């Protein structure tokens, strides 16, 4: 079974924060690579527990994925993002 998802990495002070917006998981590390590694570990542990409970497919559906053959694919796809600036009152 396969699942493709997005990872965002942010630097906050001396730490790096890795987020998966589609799955609503987050982790941190001292480096970008460590934060990503920790995030993968969190996702794997959570998915194993959900699979044992029989709730994994339901969770993925709530996160906006649907099962197609041997993969879960997003129902919607991010096509871009922008950094904008507005004037505050």
Predicted regions and their residues:
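Short aromatic-glycine-(Arg/Gly/Cys) micro-motifs in beta-strand/loop hairpins
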Residues: 3-22
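Short, charged, surface-exposed hinge/linker loops at domain edges
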Residues: 1-4, 37-89
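Residue-level preference for alpha-helix termini and adjacent loops
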Residues: 22-25, 78-80
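A short, exposed loop/beta-hairpin motif centered on an aromatic-Gly-Thr core
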Residues: 23-33
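Short acidic, gly/pro-rich beta-turn/loop elements at beta-sheet edges
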Residues: 17-19, 28, 37
